[in-house]
Regions:
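Non-catalytic terminal regions of proteins
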Residues: 1-44
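Active-site recognition of the HExxH zinc-binding catalytic motif
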Residues: 77-89
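Post-HExxH zinc-binding segment in Zn-dependent metallohydrolases
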Residues: 98-128
């Protein structure tokens, strides 16, 4: 269940080309905008998860709704998928056409782990999961 205490925080990509965060509902999504006219409808694409880009891709907002019917493996799969999209955008911002496979793998791993951690923090029992 989504925690009412979760507040999205920006994470900075390796080499600081972009920032990314995870939101779980419209209220959290709206918190990220100074001007409410700039915001969109939460999960407007109707997918299991999605990432939207702002400021030319320098701000990436991953959206993931209620996951009570999904397994943790399924959630991690969705977040990993979105991590790859974030990496693809960062790669463009860096001007990298053919990064080494290790550089690419470590970058995606870092982004995915950040998203996994944010997901855990966003769940009502997130702190219990970290200590067990």
């Amino acid at each position: 269940m989504i925690s009412n205490n979760y507040v999205p925080e920006w994470h900075i990509s390796p080499f600081e080309h972009s920032k990314y965060t995870l939101v779980r509902n419209q209220d959290q999504f709206d918190l990220l905008f100074d001007d409410m006219n700039d915001t969109q409808e939460f999960m407007h694409l109707g997918a299991g998860a999605q990432v939207d880009y702002y400021d030319g891709g320098k701000h990436c907002i991953v959206q993931l709704g209620d996951c009570s019917e999904r397994t943790l493996i399924e959630v991690h799969g969705l977040l990993l998928h979105e991590a790859v999209h974030i990496w693809q955008r960062i790669k463009k911002l860096m001007g990298e056409k053919k990064p080494s496979t290790e550089f690419e793998a470590y970058s995606i791993q870092r982004i995915a782990q950040d998203l996994f951690s944010m997901f855990q923090e966003s769940e009502t029992d997130g702190m219990e999961k970290q200590t067990n």
